Amino acid sequence: MTLVAGSATAGYGRVPAAPAQPPQTIVFPVLGPVEYIDDFGAPRPGGPHQGIDILAPKRALALAAEAGKIKFWTSSATAGCMLYLYGASGTTYYYIHLNNDLTAKNDNKGKCVAGTAYAKGLKNGAKVAAGQVLGYVGNSGDADGGPTHLHFELHPNGGKGVDAYPWLQSGQHLLFASGRGTAFTLDLRGTVSAVTADTLRIKAASVTAWPMRQGQPLSLKVLVNVPSSAIVQTVKGMGKPGTPADLLDAKPGQKVQVWTGAAPTTLKAERGGALNASLVSLLGR
């Protein structure tokens, strides 16, 4: 039999398609400070641990690891308030033990609904963007009474779960999370790392995003464009009146506060890219 390329019948001679793989880099699924170890496969009463527990404050924002479609799961006494993210790569992600409290206490008075467990306004079956807020960290299900955390699982091609630790280690931590296109302003504080006539690289120690009021400590180098319209000043204390300064006067290691100009939210901006300063305050030395 002679096979003509592209004309195989009933699959004869076809090369099976390679199984879908997770993206090399995912958005880290929790915003802000976290603690976690590689506890995948660790002994548990119900069998080996199938995910990674990411410890985070109550109601910390759980974020979409990649773009995809979500499904609420509310009927598991073990998982509590849970969500599936069916990623565009073919990977399925599990978000387990989301919040079910209505107060700062462990009251268990909330339901697995948008605004309590899931992001406000999020609908079951919705398509989501990478980095979009999906829900809130909690301790529902059999995690009740324990430390608040996100039990995170990664299932390539929707199959058996694998150790998500390598993806978390290389995951992209966001500076903030907001709806695409909504206006934001950042208050970045840290020290000068490098400077040119129109850019400032800082070693950021903290960031606060407005008007979302999302603040977190950082240890991250961030490059900020400084257009000619930006105000550059020297101050004797952060928040105090300043005197005009030249950006090139900034010295490595000098303390600095940068306010970015109001801009529409994009994933690139959430990652710390395409930021433009409106005010640069250099602490006098």
Regions found by a protein language model. Give the residues of each.
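Secretory targeting and sorting signals
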Residues: 1-12
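A short hydrophobic beta-strand segment most commonly corresponding to one strand
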Residues: 149-158
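Surface-exposed, glycine-biased beta-strand/turn segments
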Residues: 10-91, 100-101, 129-130, 139, ...
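Flexible glycine-rich surface loops and low-complexity tracts that mediate binding to linear polymers
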Residues: 136, 248-275
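Active-site region of chymotrypsin-like
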Residues: 49-52, 87-124
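Short nucleic-acid-contacting surface segments enriched for D/E, G, S/T with interspersed K/R
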Residues: 118-127, 237-258
